[in-house]
Amino acid sequence: MSWMTDYVRPKLRGLLQRDVPDNLWTNCESCGQMMLTKELERSEKVCPHCGHHMRATAKERLGWTFDGGEYTTIELPKMPVDPLGFKDSKRYTDRLKDARHKSHLDEALVVAHGMIKGQKAVVAVMAPEFLLGTMGAALGEAFVAACRLAVLQKAPLVVYTASGGARMQEGVVSLMQMPRTTIGVQMLQEAGLPYVVVFTNPTTGGVSASFAMLGDVHIAEPNALIAFAGPRVIQDTVREKLPEGFQRSEYLREHGMVDIVAKRSELPELLGRILGIMMRQKTVSDAAA
């Protein structure tokens, strides 16, 4: 036996067999650079190489938004499951079970209340990890519950949007959530409460055509896709080449659809300033009345 076979080979074999977590490294979706997942999480899932804002979970956004990461979530109303008895390659009820198991959420919207830079606020965050953040009856009812909570607490409502649109498994029931959520926004308007929307990537379909576009202030993360139909569908329909950056945050800001494009790290401070100004204006208006 030699030194090579007695020591080196077993050592190499042990190194190769050592368990390495599957999620130790993450590749940037934009530039392709590899980075440690823990480092990415410390940077709020923004690529340190190119600044690309990667997809975040609802709970991560709540932690980044509220002061000290402290907030209280509310229990959302229970809605009938699978009203149409829908089945394609898989039963809708089974898809919901899988989504709840993987995301540890009951629906694609999480509602919480707490403080943002000292300002009381209600925050509703859409969860792309739950069926791509699609909107069904339960999400519509959850949004209305967020509006009611804001009115009850006399607090502003901040909504982070991230959605693939209406949930096809619920058919017309899903489409009816567009006017349903609009009624929720009207409740805020009647109470004179600020309603701020933060667009994240992607915000599309029925969500973009309803409550997402009704904010008093529209903020967007950089390069977020904000659209009803995607650019490929539009290009195939009109048979013309679309402008560079079409339907992205910066393009929409230039054309008046978005007020501010802000980096993720800037959002808490920005929201705190905006909500503070708007709530002071409400106080002055109430006193004058």
Curated annotation (Swiss-Prot):
Residue pairs linked by disulfide bridges in the UniProt entry: none
MF terms (GO), sorted A to Z: acetyl-CoA carboxylase activity; ATP binding; carboxyl- or carbamoyltransferase activity; zinc ion binding
Gene3D superfamilies the UniProt entry points to: 2-enoyl-CoA Hydratase, Chain A, domain 1 (3.90.226.10)
Reactions catalysed: N(6)-carboxybiotinyl-L-lysyl-[protein] + acetyl-CoA = N(6)-biotinyl-L-lysyl-[protein] + malonyl-CoA
Residues annotated as binding Zn(2+): 28, 31, 47, 50
Zinc finger (C4-type): 28-50
Claim: Zinc-finger is one of the keywords in the record: yes
All residue ranges annotated as the CoA carboxyltransferase N-terminal domain in the record: 24-289
Cellular component GO terms held in the UniProt record: acetate CoA-transferase complex
Class of the enzyme per the UniProt entry, highest EC level: transferase
Free-text comment on the cofactor: Binds 1 zinc ion per subunit.
InterPro entries: AcCoA_carboxyl_beta, Acetyl_CoA_COase_Trfase_b_su, ClpP/crotonase-like_dom_sf, COA_CT_N, Znf-ACC
Major localisation: cytoplasm
GO biological process, one term: fatty acid biosynthetic process
Source domain of life: Bacteria
Subcellular location: Cytoplasm
Family stated for the protein in its record: Belongs to the AccD/PCCB family.
Function according to Swiss-Prot or TrEMBL: Component of the acetyl coenzyme A carboxylase (ACC) complex. Biotin carboxylase (BC) catalyzes the carboxylation of biotin on its carrier protein (BCCP) and then the CO(2) group is transferred by the transcarboxylase to acetyl-CoA to form malonyl-CoA.
HAMAP family assigned to the protein according to its UniProt record, in alphabetical order: AcetylCoA_CT_beta (MF_01395)
Subunit structure as annotated in this protein's UniProt entry: Acetyl-CoA carboxylase is a heterohexamer composed of biotin carboxyl carrier protein (AccB), biotin carboxylase (AccC) and two subunits each of ACCase subunit alpha (AccA) and ACCase subunit beta (AccD).
PANTHER family in the record: ACETYL-COENZYME A CARBOXYLASE CARBOXYL TRANSFERASE SUBUNIT BETA, CHLOROPLASTIC
Protein name: Acetyl-coenzyme A carboxylase carboxyl transferase subunit beta
